[in-house]
C-alpha cells in the first residue's frame, strides 16, 4: 500500500526565510559552480512545437537537462508544503478525476479556464512569492526566479511551472477561496481550470472572482455554466451521484479495440497500448465512484 507523502506548513519549509546560497545548493543537491551554470537564464532553453491530438500545436519552452533536474528538485520542495483542500494539481494523491468528484451532487457548476496561464505568469509574481511569501533574501529570491522563469514568465516545459503557477498567485487564490467558503461554494483548482459549484452560484460572485483574476493580470477564455444537468469538469462528467467518462472516451476505447483486431505489428502494439491507457482511465473513474459510495469513517 503506498505511503502518504509527508507535508509541512509553509513556514516549516527548508526554503522558508532562506538567506544562504550554500544552503540553497545543499537543498538542490548541487555545487555553487553548478548553481552558476544553471543560472544562465534564457540561454538554457530550446523552443519547439508539438502537434495536439485535437488539432493545432502546443508551444514548448524546454529547459536543458541540468536546469530541468534542478527545477524538478525545487518543485518537490514546494510540493512538500501542505496544499489547500481546493488545489488538485500538482498534488500527490489527487488527480483530474478526484478534482471533478468534489463537485458531485451540486446543482450548479461553473468553470473558468485561465488563458495561457504559464506565459501570462510574469517573473515579478514569481519573485514576489519567493521574497514576500517564502521570505527568502532578495538575492536568493532573484536567483530562484532566474531558475524558475524564461523570457520573464513561467516556461511551458518546466516541471516547476505547475506548482509555481499556484504559488505565484498565492494571495489571489486565498481571496477566491475565502469568498467561496463564505458563500458555501465548493472550489477546486486544477492548473488553469477553476471550478466553483453549489446549490446556487450567483453571477455577482463569479464577477468578483473574475475581478480578482483581472486585477492579477490573468484572463479567462472559456466559461462554462451547468445548471441542473451533468457537468464536464477536467474531462470527467459530474452527476448528482457520481462521475462518469464522457461518451467520446468510450468511443475512443471502441475504436482502439477495433484497431487491435484489424492491425498488425507495431501498429497493433500501439493500439494495445491505447486500449490499456483508456481502460486505466475508466478504472480510475470507477475507483473514485467507489470512494463516493463508501460511508464516511
Q: How should these model regions be labeled?
A:
Residues 1-51, 55-112, 117-158, 167-178, ...:
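Right-hand nucleic-acid polymerase module
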Residues 84, 180-187:
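Surface-exposed helix-capping loop/turn segments at secondary-structure junctions
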Residues 186-190, 222-224:
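Short beta-strand
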